[in-house]
Amino acid sequence: MLLSDLLGQPLVYVFAHGEALVDPSRIDAAMRRRLAGEPLQYIRGKTEFFGREFRVDERVLIPRPETEILVETAIERIDRGARVVDIGTGSGCIAVTVALERPDLRVIATDVSVAALAVAAQNANGAVRLVGSDLLAAFVEDFDWIVSNPPYVKAAEIETLATEVRDHEPRGALTPGPAGTEVIARILDQAGRAGLILEIAYGQLEAVRDLAAAHHFNVDAVRNDLAGIPRVVVLSRHGWK
């Protein structure tokens, strides 16, 4: 795949044209980056998510397969014509995919990082409205649904992550603090009557249940990933299912 990217040609071309040459300096630069532990997705400048290609670089997290469960849940559960906000959009993969799969929805994507929004803008191509905001601070309007893959890694667990993640992906998008639930708590504080679809960490379900109850939210559904780990929760305000 990397050779295909360097040549700017599909894999079929690469296999059929063995004589095709790539500037050796470009190969050397790419190999040095890979040997330094940089994720292949950053070197290629793109990755696949939900059957679509998204641009990625060190300004945003690399979309994971687990997050496709969040998107599937949103596509299935969100009411027709709803107003939806994706908090902490990063590359924009969640917001863009939901908007394209459910064109009846009005989707807005937010991020506190201007750098991340620049990447999201390349991926959105006008499909969603992008707003720089610390969670929902920039809004006076209400939303029907909030979707988010927030930072959720406990600060003490950062050093246990794979080197590719720990040393290359944006730290602020990985961990919110010691508990790992700090941003989730803030989202619940600001959610109003909106339903929520959130990605959570391994072992975090009970803490999220407690936070939801403290903020008067029901846990309506829990979706597991392929390893059987609770990965996505659906929440609604008491009395607003």
Predicted regions and their residues:
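Mobile active-site "lid"/loop adjacent to the S-adenosyl-L-methionine
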Residues: Y152-E182
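Conserved beta-strand segments of alpha/beta enzyme cores
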Residues: E53, R106, A127-R129, N218-A221
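Flexible, glycine-/basic-rich loop-and-beta segments that form/coincide
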Residues: H238-K241
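Short loop/edge segments at beta-strand edges and connector loops
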Residues: R44, V131-S133, I200, N224
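Conserved AdoMet
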Residues: L3-E76
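Residue-level signal for inorganic ion chemistry
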Residues: L2, G37, T67, I94, ...
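Conserved SAM/SAH cofactor-binding pocket of Class I
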Residues: P65-T160
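Conserved Class I SAM-dependent methyltransferase catalytic core
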Residues: P178-S236
